[in-house]
Amino acid sequence: MSSRRTAPWFLAVVALALAGCATRPINAPLEQVDRKSGYRYETRAERPGNDPSTVVVLAFSGGGMRAAAFSYGVLEELRRTEVSIGGNRTRLIDEVDLITGVSGGSFTALAYGLHGERLFDDYEQRFLKRDVQGELVARSLNPFNWWKFVGGSAGRSELAAEYYDEILFNGATFGDLDRG
């Protein structure tokens, strides 16, 4: 083969080899943990208006967008429901001490943890009423995103994480939960 014919192949092999060297950033380990601060049950349980004698725990299951919509409906109903605790009227949502979620249910749990009452302003439009799966497929098929798949440094999960961050989480980190 002539050098003209081998040059493109050589460049392709070099590009693939270099792409194989790419790695995802790894979270730096914590040097020290302060158990009296940050987002944890012990620091969040005693909030103004929350009765310490009542513990309400929500567990949102998976199931994709249906689970996200169902868990959102649960929060809406808890927001509308008033109860009497210790002679005081309060909304049931104000008594929620802990929310856990997996898969589809985790979107609503996390969004509520980050945004609190603001969740009810635009969660439906920003997330529930979007064609999320269609957008993720479109991004996967977009040639401008294909470079992310080379070398194993990223994949569909990273594309999805970028999209969720763009439409729902806005660059939030675990540390932002403490402010919600």
Model-identified regions with their sequence ranges:
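Catalytic domains of lipid- and phosphate-ester/thioester hydrolases
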Residues: 2-8, 12, 20-180
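Conserved Rossmann-like nucleotide-binding pocket used by diverse enzymes
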Residues: 17
